[in-house]
């Protein structure tokens, strides 16, 4: 296993996506416990992936991208992130949090 350390960074868009889903579950579906559990699961999944961010298959996209996207599945949702080489650091940049049935190619 590599000794590579990754710096974790989030895009504001990820926070917007996450907040939208959490608020919907808590307020519209009236299930704050499920919303809190989802939030905990998302946080745990990201931190578990951080030590080996590039050890998983990249997402194959029809679009040409500067950095390949990787996925983390959490319940009915998908977290999308990229790994950016910034000199001495490698950054795991978490970009989107989408419902797994959304049309991904239109939003990422």
Where do the model's predicted regions map?
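Conserved short aromatic-hydrophobic micro-motifs
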Residues: 42, 49-50, 81, 94
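Short coil/loop residues immediately preceding or within conserved phosphate-binding loops
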Residues: 5, 69, 89
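Inter-domain helical "communication" segments and dimerization helices
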Residues: 2, 58, 85-88
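A general structural signal marking secondary-structure boundaries and capping sites
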Residues: 25, 29, 53-54, 101
């Amino acid at each position: 296993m590599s000794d590579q350390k990754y710096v974790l960074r989030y895009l504001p868009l990820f926070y917007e996506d996450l907040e939208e889903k959490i608020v919907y579950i808590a307020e519209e579906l009236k299930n704050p416990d499920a919303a809190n559990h989802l939030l905990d699961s998302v946080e745990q999944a990201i931190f578990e992936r951080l030590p080996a961010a590039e050890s998983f298959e990249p997402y194959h996209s029809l679009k040409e991208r500067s950095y390949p996207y990787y996925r983390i599945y959490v319940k009915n949702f998908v977290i999308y992130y990229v790994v950016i080489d910034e000199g001495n650091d490698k950054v795991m940049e978490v970009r989107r949090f989408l419902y797994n049935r959304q049309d991904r190619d239109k939003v990422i």
